[in-house]
Amino acid sequence: MQRLDLATIAPTPWKNGGGATRALACWPPGAGLERFGWRVSVADVAAPGPFSLYPGVDRQILLLQGDGVHLRAADGSVDQALDRATPPFAFAGETAIDCTLRGGPVRDFNLMLRRGQWRGALRVWHGACTPGESPAGLCLVLAGHWERAGEAYAPGQGLWWSTPRPGVPLRPVPGGLDHPALAWVALEPEI
């Protein structure tokens, strides 16, 4: 189980130059964009433009901050508005998607899965959960304060794992002003 903190991860410019990404975790560790089995990141989108293409990769996106985006594919297969109330949206990485901003810059959470190698789901979770229940995964605090085995977790902090080792639950700390929320990713190998 590895602890992570978004504030300590340096941003990397996108392949298409329209924003920057902070890679939270990937498998295998240190794998580049052409070799990962799965990858989880947080992106800052500063300008409208096309998404980078990732053939053979299934993607899921969740808006975290900002007024929202509208995703459209030239072939009509995608026409989706996303805001902070929208559940995670899944699409194929080889689909040519254009992104327009519905206001200013936005921040989103991204899950990318190499098709035929990994499958998984991105959800927003509000109650206690147990990291390590799935073969691999990641959780990131989005709102509220959380606690696990006496360690505090604030927004932007979390855990990732690559082997199933259920252990101590991660729980929201009662009494906070924010409604507690986690980005929760559960992953399983397909092969």
Regions found by a protein language model. Name each.
Residues M1-A23, F36, V40, G68, ...:
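Cytosolic regulatory regions built on CNB/CRP/Popeye-like sensor folds
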Residues Q2, P50-F51, S134, G156:
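Alpha-helical membrane-anchoring segments
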Residues D5, P13, D75-A96, H126-P131, ...:
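Short acidic-glycine-tyrosine-enriched beta hairpin
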Residues K15-G49, D58, I97-C129:
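A short glycine-rich, His/Asp/Glu-containing loop-to-beta-strand
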Residues P28, D44, Q65, A73, ...:
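Short, structured patches in soluble enzyme cores that scaffold and shape functional sites
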Residues V57-A74, G132-G150, G156:
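Glycine- and acidic-residue-biased ligand/ion/polar-headgroup-sensing regions
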